[in-house]
Each structure stands twice: as C-alpha cells, then as structure tokens.
C-alpha cells in the first residue's frame, strides 16, 4: 500500500479526540455499555463524532475542525452534555483520566469491530490492557514538508504535554508512583516511540515504502508513535496526552499546541536534528514518572532544569501567539496550575488520601467531568 498524498488543511486549525471511561454508578468500575451509549448518541445532532474504542467500556469523542481552543471547548461542551444525558438514562457515568484506577484488565471485552478483533488476535492480552484513555490533538499544517518540521519541533515539548495532562497514577488499585502510567502500556507495542527524523515528505515516503515492503506495516494506523503525520487530514497528531479529567483542560492543552505551532511557523526557531532524540526517551520517562516535578534536559544545550520551569518559560515565550489565536485564557490556566505543581494526577492522589476508597475517587472524577467544581 502506498502512502496517501498529504491533503490540504488550513494551517493551525485544531481537532481534538478524547477516549473516555464508561463506569457503573453502583461501584464505579468500568461497565460494558459502549454499544448502548453509541445507540443513544446517534439520535443527537452534534459536531464531530462519537465512536467505539478497543474495549466495550470505553468510547472516543472528537470535535470537528476548530480554529481556536474556545471553539474546541464549545464543541466538547455540546458533546459532553449529550454524553452525560445518555449516560444518566443507562445509570452509568462518563469519566476522564488516563487509566481507570482499579479495573482488572482480564475482565475487559474487545468491541465487536473487525479492526479491533484483528488487533486482539495480533497483540493478545496487550489489547485488553490497552483499556487506557488518551487525548489526541491534530494541528493543521501548510504542506507535507512543513508537517514533518512541525512534528519534530513538537517532539522537544513532549515532556510538557505528558506532565500537563498526566492523570493516570493508579493501575489495578495500586499507586504506580508514575503521574502518567498510561504511556507504559503504549510502549509495549512494537511500532510505538517516535517517528524517524526525516524532514521532507519524499524521504518519509521512502521510509514508509521500506516498512510496507517488510510486511510489518500496511497503513499509518499501524504506527503508534507519540506524534504521527495524518496525511488524509493534512495534520500531525499528538498522541501522548492522558485524557484530562475536565474538558476545560483538554481545550487548554489544544490551545497550547496551537500557540507552539504558531511560533514554529512564524519564527522557524530551530531546525530539528537526529541529535534532538538523544535525550528524548529520558525526558519522556521523567515526565511520565514525576510529572511537573520532572527534570528536563534541553536537547540543544544539554542543560538540566526543572521541567516546570521550562514549561513556564515556554508559556511566556508563546504568549503573544496565544493572544493572536484566542488561547490567552487557556495558557493562563495552564500557567497558574503549573506554578502550583497541580495536575490531574495530583488531584487524584489528593482525593485518594482524603477518601481512601478509589471508587469514591472515581465518583468524584465523574462529577468533575460533568462540570462540577470539586
């Protein structure tokens, strides 16, 4: 199969996908209600889409093409409100977060869709363990070569995205000591990690053709990279975010991506090289493990600094681009919480210390997703 041509999209437009938990309101464990939710949601006219995911206790929502983080929030609000109404009819709840805190992976059932069944056959138990929940952000790129430059420039900020969205400290009722344990599950897949450092579409086509000749890859969907090109949309897709507990944070993260992308296009601040990736895995691990308390190694200088400080410096640096694109409020929210060391992983741990029972933590997380201020 040849690589699809890179389609035109309006630069800096946004699209957001969120994978969400469906839980029983009796015990707040995952509940196999995806099919029922999809049936109810089909009756509601909404922007974007609502589709099944790998197992039948999760669904994915997505916005349409948006021009700002406020438009993202507006569309997510419409979809969220419809989800909540449908869930109430089924006596279930919808919850954010990168992992469910106490579900047992072996109890999961693969959703009855050919691609999911194929993946289950190929990956075995990993498919059920893939009951994890991420946010994906698409950003429109002017052309194919610009998309690859954008992808590799964004790679320096992967630790930012991980720490700011981290919401998966618990796995099977245990505190993993990671802020984002979700990404450990992604690393188990053979085509995960990062894209090859090529900066022209012709080079990328050569790489893709070599991979397809091996028989290992049939399409771009087979790559589980942290960031991957999406030629059919004319975007790159950033895939490292945990699903936040609130749609407000999800929209703010999209605003941060858009502000970074605007800076890249306006100033071309640096040319990515293979050496950028010498510290990539280390920085990624630090952000997963320690969140906003991580150490960040600058790929260009080799300097070590607190990740929190690097995020705050970058937020200040892109502030004028945020203003141009209506993301100032989003960045203000992220700046305030970063300065306090506050992310969703910390909120979940604080609730657990106070409540003890993870089911109660999940119940309160469901209320936060509904828009309650807890």
UniProtKB/Swiss-Prot annotation:
SUPFAM superfamilies (UniProt xref): Glutamine synthetase/guanido kinase (SSF55931)
Enzyme class of the recorded protein, top EC level: ligase
Domain of life assignment: Bacteria
Keywords recorded for this protein, A-Z: ATP-binding, Ligase, Nucleotide-binding
InterPro entries reported for this sequence: GCL_type2/YbdK_subfam, GCS2, Gln_synth/guanido_kin_cat_dom, YbdK
UniProt GO molecular function: ATP binding; glutamate-cysteine ligase activity
Example GO biological process: modified amino acid biosynthetic process
Catalysed transformations (reactions): L-cysteine + L-glutamate + ATP = gamma-L-glutamyl-L-cysteine + ADP + phosphate + H(+)
The EC number(s) this enzyme carries: 6.3.2.2
Function statement: ATP-dependent carboxylate-amine ligase which exhibits weak glutamate--cysteine ligase activity.
Membership in a protein family: Belongs to the glutamate--cysteine ligase type 2 family. YbdK subfamily.
Identification of the protein by name: Putative glutamate--cysteine ligase 2
Lineage: Bacteria, Pseudomonadati, Pseudomonadota, Betaproteobacteria, Burkholderiales
